[in-house]
């Protein structure tokens, strides 16, 4: 009811929505990183946090260049979504559960960027398109690392 389609938003509003999503992702992955025990998994989750932080800076700069104010937090709707993820964070106790939830959350972020690009590409300047495409590529590379890490640990998921 409260969610607008991405197509109903201006390009900078939609970029801001993605920025809020990055803030939410950083919060979620910071919680996961604190809970996990494996140093390798902590390092991998820290890579996600660092990537999201870098992308948040890039999006903020682009939104400012478009003449709008970048979001500085997840916003009201983001808080509601964050509450749902908080429940999942609380229930994910083992490293394998944390990894499984991390992969799901990370894939959701990639899907949101792909959806944004699909619905907004004809309204974006070339620089914005390149920025989002690069973000998708960087996220897909890190997604491969998460999946590669999960392969030897997958037996713990079932």
Regions found by a protein language model. Give the residues of each.
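Alpha-helical bundle segments that constitute or directly flank the non-heme di-iron/ferroxidase center
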Residues: 4-36, 97-122
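Preference for long, well-ordered alpha-helical segments
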Residues: 105-158
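Amphipathic alpha-helices that form helix-helix packing interfaces
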Residues: 18, 25, 32, 55, ...
């Amino acid at each position: 009811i409260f969610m607008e389609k991405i197509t109903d938003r201006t390009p900078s509003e939609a970029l801001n929505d993605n920025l809020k999503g990055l803030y939410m992702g950083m919060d979620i992955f910071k919680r996961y990183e604190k809970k996990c025990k494996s140093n390798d998994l902590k390092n991998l989750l820290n890579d996600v946090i660092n990537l999201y932080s870098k992308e948040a800076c890039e999006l903020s700069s682009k939104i400012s260049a478009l003449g709008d104010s970048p979001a500085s937090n997840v916003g009201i709707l983001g808080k509601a979504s964050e509450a749902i993820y908080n429940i999942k964070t609380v229930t994910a106790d083992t490293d394998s559960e944390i990894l499984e939830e991390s992969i799901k959350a990370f894939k959701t972020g990639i899907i949101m960027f792909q959806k944004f690009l699909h619905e907004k590409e004809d309204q974006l300047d070339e620089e914005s398109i390149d920025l989002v495409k690069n973000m998708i590529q960087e996220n897909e590379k890190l997604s491969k690392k998460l999946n590669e890490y999960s392969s030897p640990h997958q037996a713990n998921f079932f």
